[in-house]
Amino acid sequence: MRKKVLISGAICVALCSILLCGCGSASAESGSGSGITITNVSYDPTRELYAAYNDLFENYYEGEKGITVNVIQSHGGSGSQARSVVEGASADVVTLALAHDITLIEEAGLIKPGWIDEFDRQSSPYTSTIVFLVRSGNPKNLHDWNDLINEGVAIITPDPKSSGGACWNFLAAWEYARRNISEDEEAIKDFMAALYANVTVMDSGARGATTTFVENGQGDVLLAWENEALQTLKEYPDEYEIISPSVSILAQPSVAIVDENAEKNNTADIAKDYLEYLYSEDAQRLIGTYGYRPSDQSILQEFSDKFDLGMTLCTIDDFGGWNAAYDIYFKDGGIFDEIYER
């Protein structure tokens, strides 16, 4: 396999940890008229969503409870963000790309066991899936996963070692191969090795991968969160197309209170209110507007013209849940490493 370009998120994570630690301990206390500040450590492509949601929540909370709230956002590759919290970033809440990243914070003693049942729908207020973003006219004629292994196709995808979206990308491709090529693991590995041989750049997070594809003009196809692809179409309506592969995956980002930090910062109640409000009708409609699939199925149907609701989607349960999937595919020495090092 030829050498890839790997862009590390380590520097970004270190800076994020320093900045959030510096502001977190003093930020969350309610002062005389100064209100309350909480920090949301999130994954890469949620910047626009949470900028809008924070305004919605802040206005709601001041109107309902007379309390001024300021929400600080932090964004990066989901795995890197989880590690930054473990290493000291003072997050009151985390809104990450996959449950396993929150489990890492739980295992560090910062989040109480049972967090996945604290909020509705397994603490997943919105979902997404994985699609292909191609240039207008689809010049390489890419329609499904098997087209991505063709000679001369340049793929852009983030690195599963730092990006939650990249893990969803990998699993969606794996499930396609299992259903359409062979159930034999070695045959699936061969397919995945051919696919990753065509990856030319691996950024540390989904937004970085989008920048590589869109701003820098590299690659023929971006393996993208559906919401990120929709955002790109909104910004560049005549330059790109979304391709829905025959098989993808129901990506379920997760949210949780970072209990130890929230208790220390005296923000536990408002942190809970902040995450609960994601399930309100107003927030669910905002979520749909920003290209995420509302977890409220009735509101999701209001966006049926925006999302391809007929896609065949596997789920993380098809891989035994996130803890099992992470150990098999993404831990050091796992299947991803085996494939990538071929």
Outline where the language-model segments fall:
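N-terminal segment of the mature folded domain
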Residues: 28-162, 340
